[in-house]
Amino acid sequence: MTKSELVEIIAQKQPQLSIKDVELAVKTIIEYMSQSLSQGQRIEIRGFGSFSLHYRAPRVGRNPKTGETVHLPAKYVPHFKPGKELRDEVNASLKAGY
């Protein structure tokens, strides 16, 4: 699902809201979540999951084109951990499809 598909679905389910309003709300939520993560904050949405940062230690990598070794610096990467309700819902719907 893309951001524009999400906006369309929400606008259809909430006909009292204009597409512009829904688009602004979705953009604002994503912007605020990105800002919070970039400040090192954890985001928890009960029933859905949590977003946090995971540390990746420096390591030696390899350029796939040239084969030369490259030193990769340490970094933080965003990480999503699904909540129990989301995991259960996904597993139940996938099992029903088999």
Curated annotation (Swiss-Prot):
GO terms for biological process: DNA recombination; regulation of DNA-templated transcription; regulation of translation. It comes from the Bacteria. Keywords: DNA recombination, DNA-binding, Transcription, Transcription regulation, Translation regulation. The keyword Magnesium does not apply. GO terms for molecular function: DNA binding; structural constituent of chromatin. Pfam families: Bac_DNA_binding. Signal peptide: none annotated. SMART domains: BHL (SM00411). One of its GO terms (cellular component) is cytosol. Belongs to the bacterial histone-like protein family. Heterodimer of an alpha and a beta chain. This protein is one of the two subunits of integration host factor, a specific DNA-binding protein that functions in genetic recombination as well as in transcriptional and translational control. HAMAP family: IHF_beta. This is Integration host factor subunit beta. It comes from Hahella chejuensis (strain KCTC 2396). The lineage of its organism: Bacteria, Pseudomonadati, Pseudomonadota, Gammaproteobacteria, Oceanospirillales. The gene is ihfB.
